[in-house]
Amino acid sequence: MFNFKILFRTFLVLLFIIPCTALPQSLSKVHFSTLYGLRTDSLTLSDNTALSIKREKPVLSFRLDEKMLSAGDAELRDMADGYVLQFGNSVHLKVNQPSDDSQGWQCDVEFENISADTVTISNVLPFGADSASVSISGMGPDNPARAWLSRPGYSPLRVILPDNSWELGYSSFDVQNGISVCAISRRMGTVGGIERRYETLLPPKAKVSYRIYAGIFRGDWQNGLKLMFRDRYLYDISEFDNTLYQRSDLAWIRESYLIVLQMAWDREFFDRQAGKYTFSDLLRKGIDQFGHIDAYGIWPTWPRLGLDQRNQWDLYRDLPGGIRQLRIFGGLARQNNTRLFISGNPWDVSAKPDDYMKEIAELIAEADADGVFLDIRNSSCRQLQSAADSVRSGVLMYSEGMAVPADMPGIISGRVHNDIFLSPELNLNKLIKPDFSIFRVCDVGEDILHREIAISFFNGYGTELNLFRPGGRDENYQKDLDYLAATTFILRQNNDAFLDMDWTPLIGTLADRIYVNRWRAGEKTIFTVLNLRPEGFDGKLFRIEGNIARHYVSLWNHENIIPVTEGGMTWLTANTEGWLASASGTRKEGSVDCIAEFPLLLGSKLKGDSLLLRSAGDNRVLVWKGNPSNSGVFKEFRLGRDTIISLKQLFGYYQGKIVVQLLNGKNLLDENIHYFRGGKPWMVSSVERTVRATGIAPDMLLIPGTEFTYELSAEEDFIPYPELSGLTTSVDSFLIDKYPVTNARYYEFLQSTGYRPVDTTRYLKHWKYDIYPQGQENYPVVYLSLEDMKAYARWAGKRLPTEAEWQLAAQGTDGRKWPWGNEFHGTMCNNAFGKLTPVNAFSKGMSPYEVVDLVGNVWQMTNDMYFNGSYYFMIIRGGSFYNPESGRMYIKGGPQPLDKTQMMLMVSQGYDRNATVGFRCVKDIESSYFRGKR
């Protein structure tokens, strides 16, 4: 039968997971206005829809030497094949007639130097930039990363562009009806000019040409970036071959976030003084700190190559123990979830360039290597991957640089090079191909790594610990490793989100210089937060759609986040650390947060030290002692049904944070955070059910089961009591002793069993020669420990009553204050006589169920033991014959009303035995035998 609900749900899922930034229409024409220079005033879409631009925009703007110029301010001449604009006596700009393209509108422009001096052309920006547009252009000193992204309402931030797109210009702006335009400019070539990263030098008569590509999109400004970078690959490539990305044997790199590269002469790899390898120690440290190292590369070549005639392959084979030892290391590494990399140095001409593919394949085979670090390469090639594949599957190519979009089909991993000292905040390579595995090079010997680790985490990719340069392994390095361990842990647990093909950079925030990226995986959303404000940040940060079926957690701090609703809008807060202002602009700056939006899957609850875990099906449940980490303490459960566990049994006497995580394999699905704090007590006892009675013994009475409500209070609350007010409980029917256990009855137990406690201190202190005083056979037995009482109860086939059972037996369901009614009568009980009385001395003081001697003679032990993180105590009820009157600090004695409860602090069996505490027992029943009985 057709199920419309399932179809609709499937449509919604596809709507959210399939990237969709472009519109059904495309941009067909951009119309020019020539009244003031060359400007754009309207658009025509592929379906002939005409759209006017609210405010005319120049066709482009650019920087001539140090001055920004606009096509809207130039002298214009019409040509048969386009337009020529002249900027003083310096430059001619030729704008060719636009051409149609299936992927939007494009236009070629050419700058020509008409002066007698060399000029510099840079920052060619399609449609210019204003306060309402989003743009990318070069800014600041000439260095490897000087591209800046400008957004309305925020200060610019730096971005990383592909290595062949440093000169790229980008802009986007709203048009009308929810439609926006986005455009890029790409340098196509020069005639007589000199190309530099971000600019072109034009001697006299030299030329440089650019191509402008434009398209339309709907929605947030980020969709324009997605269209140009992710969907159209900056027009570097028309179709993307995903063959390598779809290979299951290479999928491991997409779950990898930590690579270590080390030279063969490093003492952490081989200790020359001891003459032995220390590689196993390195792996062990990696496990302790990071769970594991994803990949480890050993480098025995540069800068040793050239000292003698040996080539790069010889240096591998001449390592101590030879290639056989390296192969052993490969196996050892894989046993510890680490892949072993070798390196390839194509510049090593001594290695016979013609045999390079053959030699590298042979070394992969001999070393059983899992990957190859491609020195001085930004890309790989099919021949190289094929050479590796001919040996074994799963061998990865890892380039020194980052592949440009056209080369990405041939390699699936690369690096943010340490040529860039301070990494830009946003890496747009991650937007181009979200499943391309990126690793930021952190040169340990160069400087501290903190800032670079933070930015890698913000961008959802990994880190390469590069140990080539000596030095840097000091106390700051250990701090960096701890920081890296924390980011790596979150990246791994949320790998599914960080592969989101439709992730969104830089969602709107209430504060500047604190940035948020959004990542989704199924019903989970991850927000990575990067703070570059030295004072730190704590407060409302970004808007969400309020949803009562979701909850929010900081995965960085492992704290619950309560959304803030104001003016009909809902906001999430963030908390990031600050730093000394003097550290800004250095690698000491930067702090992060990571906020998760989860569906309500776990639903775990903490009551006392009892943790309720819901059924998790095939998923894993991890219960953490404190914050989750690679070195943290946790217990794993696979639960087919709801389960209650004791935290004391898991973690001993621990107070603090408890984090519960639900994982599907390695990926986090939900997280609950609880705080297990001492002070407020929780019950640690359980009821050990007896054999169910089918009849009523002469010395017992039936208490019918019921649900009832009662109120309790305590005289002193310095040590907190359990919850006392408005207690509603359901009690099953049971039998209770009519009287407290007497000396005679306890003596019978001793004669029958020969029971003797391990600790005999104060045991039956009032007895002489192992028998009670003459004439006191019917007095309540005292000077017993909890263990003594339970031993008797087991012998009798009974147990101690819970406090609720004692309450019901004493009070009934009418809430009376005393067993006999609401008024106190001194003749109904032992009224603080200062000595014990027989248990049947006050039969008129019975309860509604005819239970006798409930108050005034001895405090009566219940089964309820509590723990507050520091102390154990039992609940006793009813008061006793002893009532100290000389000071208000004493426990109040004498008969106690039924709304008063009292704790008895526990130390040891001997210490706990006293003259005022006795007990009575109860027995479970088979209810079917007692229907209608009272």
Task: Describe these PLM feature segments.
Residues P203-S209, Y213, G394, Y398-G401, ...:
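Active-site-proximal substrate-binding groove within the catalytic cores of carbohydrate-active enzymes
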Residues E566-F598:
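C-terminal beta-strand-rich structural cap/linker in extracellular carbohydrate-active enzymes
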